[in-house]
């Protein structure tokens, strides 16, 4: 699989009281990279250029904790139905795509910096046990990504 050349339009905001703006970045990503791995690579490039990296949250990177919530091309968590941002892979996009990345925008989740929001309201619901009201069955295996035989033998 060849690398993809992607243009990112990323929401940047220096602080909760600051005005935000979109900034564009060029990214090169492998199709089997997760979306957050691609953001890590972009941040590595920004740091090498002595620029401030894009702030974003992630914790488990296994689709469990919900810390990685972003709005991608206007859709919460991106184009993958029933998936979290950390379980979204670059193969969901095409070479040459422009991807817009924003934080969740809701009064309950004020922006702290860039793509990081204050999750206090959500965390209080989770701590009270109020978010888990439906039996959804067993959880899918974390990070279950099929790898082709040819790729596995490389």
Each language-model region and where it sits:
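Signature of N-terminal electron-transfer/Fe-S-associated modules in redox systems
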Residues: 1-153
